[in-house]
């Protein structure tokens, strides 16, 4: 349906914008960009999807395996996992910083802040690779709580997990849960420190 809608818009506006067209999008929009190109290859001159997931089911499972075994080098994957473990080991010291951050940003969640903190730490590996951030910029594990926390918040803002009433992408999450699918988290290396259990 989205590809048909885009084709109708392109057809309607062709007389106003007669030159070459570009289609782009991120996440679901990236997928839509690819579908649009597949169904209407002559509508646009360029298709530029930024992150265009093609999940095979509601619980795809490929992302976790890829991040655990294939993303980057073994040393990079270990550095990311070590950072995540350190952030979880320090959770009791990080929670006052996290609670303050949440309060300063007027964030509200459906679950306890400790659960959201876990999700932020779990999201870190996917987010780092998705946005192409350099692994060598991860601070030393001997850095202060404040330095490690600031780095984590820069890379994974907890606004991603906002209460549905405050999240303008709620409709996407509903569709992802019911139709499109979404990635999960590999929690095995972290279970002893997590408050979230699945």
Where are these regions (language model features)?
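Alpha/beta-hydrolase active-site loop
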Residues: 1-16
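Short, surface-exposed basic-aromatic patches at helix termini and helix-loop junctions that form
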Residues: 15, 36-45
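Alpha/beta-hydrolase fold nucleophile elbow
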Residues: 17-27
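Structural recognition of the beta-strand scaffold that forms the well-ordered cores
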Residues: 22-24, 46-49, 176-178
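Glycine-rich nucleophile elbow surrounding the catalytic serine of serine-hydrolase chemistry
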Residues: 25-35
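Short, flexible loop/turn elements at secondary-structure junctions
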Residues: 27-28, 51-54, 181
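A catalytic-pocket lid/entrance helix-loop region that shapes and gates access to the active site
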Residues: 43-100
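Alpha/beta-hydrolase fold active-site neighborhood
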Residues: 100-198
């Amino acid at each position: 349906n989205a590809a048909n809608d885009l084709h109708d818009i392109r057809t309607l506006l062709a007389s106003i914008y007669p030159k070459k067209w570009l289609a782009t999008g991120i996440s679901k929009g990236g997928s839509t960009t690819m579908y649009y190109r597949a169904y209407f290859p002559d509508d646009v001159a360029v298709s530029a999807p930024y992150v265009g997931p093609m999940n095979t089911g509601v619980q795809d499972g490929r992302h976790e395996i890829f991040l655990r075994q294939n993303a980057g080098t073994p040393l990079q994957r270990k550095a990311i996992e070590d950072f995540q473990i350190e952030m979880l080991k320090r959770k009791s010291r990080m929670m006052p910083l996290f609670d303050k951050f949440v309060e300063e940003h007027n964030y509200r969640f459906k679950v306890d802040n400790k659960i959201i903190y876990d999700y932020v730490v779990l999201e870190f590996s996917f987010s780092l690779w998705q946005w192409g951030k350099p692994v060598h910029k991860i601070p030393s594990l001997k850095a202060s709580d404040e330095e490690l926390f600031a780095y984590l918040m820069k890379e994974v803002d907890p606004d991603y997990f906002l209460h549905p009433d405050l999240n303008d992408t709620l409709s996407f999450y509903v569709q992802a849960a019911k139709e499109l699918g979404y990635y999960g988290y590999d929690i095995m290396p972290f279970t002893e420190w997590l408050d979230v259990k699945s």
